[in-house]
Amino acid sequence: INAMAMLAVCDSLGHDTAIAAKRLASFTNLPGRGAFSSGKFDGTAITLIDDSYNAGPASMKAAFASLTVNPPQIMVLSEMLELGDGSAAAHTALAPGILSLRPRVVITIGTEMSRMAAALPCSAVHEPAADAEAATDRLRAHLRDGDTVFIKGSNGSGAWRVAATLIDA
């Protein structure tokens, strides 16, 4: 949608949309903002969806909605920060989106996210982790060849460290 809007603005300003489209075609996602990558981690072939830079209620729900066609087998979710008194309710409200994706494993980082996932009435294995290092260890134990791993969380919660470990492997 953003790309289409950008092309419409270029057109309305009288710029060459063909040039804009060519430049847009070479655009790559910034680290932690939904980039897809494939490779091996500890000898296991995986696809990583790294959305570890930002997490709020709306961006979490939008991310879950974008995953419905090819849902991940493993989700690594860290807390949404700076939500104040509404934090518990905002985390609990994520449950339907997670349930709809039917992940095999949900690894959570942080108290609020772990509390939410522990209450999920689904067949997914829930692995709570105190920090990114523990989450990476739990991830190692569950990876299977061909898995898609989705990582989402607030930058300050450290989910990006899990993604960095996978990318650098």
Predicted regions and their residues:
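ATP-dependent carboxylate-amine ligase
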Residues: 4-169
